Swiss-Prot record:
GO terms for biological process: translation. InterPro entries: Ribosomal_Su5_D2-typ_SF, Ribosomal_uS5, Ribosomal_uS5_bac-type, Ribosomal_uS5_C, Ribosomal_uS5_N, Ribosomal_uS5_N_CS, Ribsml_uS5_D2-typ_fold_subgr. It comes from Ralstonia nicotianae (strain ATCC BAA-1114 / GMI1000). This is Small ribosomal subunit protein uS5. GO terms for molecular function: rRNA binding; structural constituent of ribosome.
Amino acid sequence: MAKIQPKVQGDERDDGLREKMIAVNRVTKVVKGGRILGFAALTVVGDGDGRIGMGKGKAKEVPVAVQKAMDEARRKMVKVPLKNGTLQHEVIGKHGAAKVLMAPAKEGTGVIAGGPMRAIFEVMGVTNIVTKSHGSTNPYNMVRATLDGLRKMSTPAEIAAKRGKSVEEILG
């Protein structure tokens, strides 16, 4: 039986960053003389160790749009604190009508995530996670909601510092 290739493409760069293209949209501008075609690309870039960035690019040709998106993703990378290849704690991210729930998982669970979320966790280096998305399935909104949730992630040390307690008291 033939295996269906996923829409997401990825590769490892010489600088150690992993790149994945999530979506390419063809857009049309109608002018008096006819139609002007263009392309919009959505990509994510990660280092496999908790850093992740999202980029959007627009151009008249697909490769140029993808390259612009990759460059923007590299510039906008943020660090997310991971714990043994999974998240620190359960977190919810929202953007527009998209809502995503992300929860840490035990070793051996794998990446249980759909669509654009899977690409994010693969380039980020997350190996065990359970996710659920609600509302909008638009790739742009899902990626933004996922990144919103990941930005809310905090380590036990950060929480302990905010509360004025020790890490042992926080972890119980």
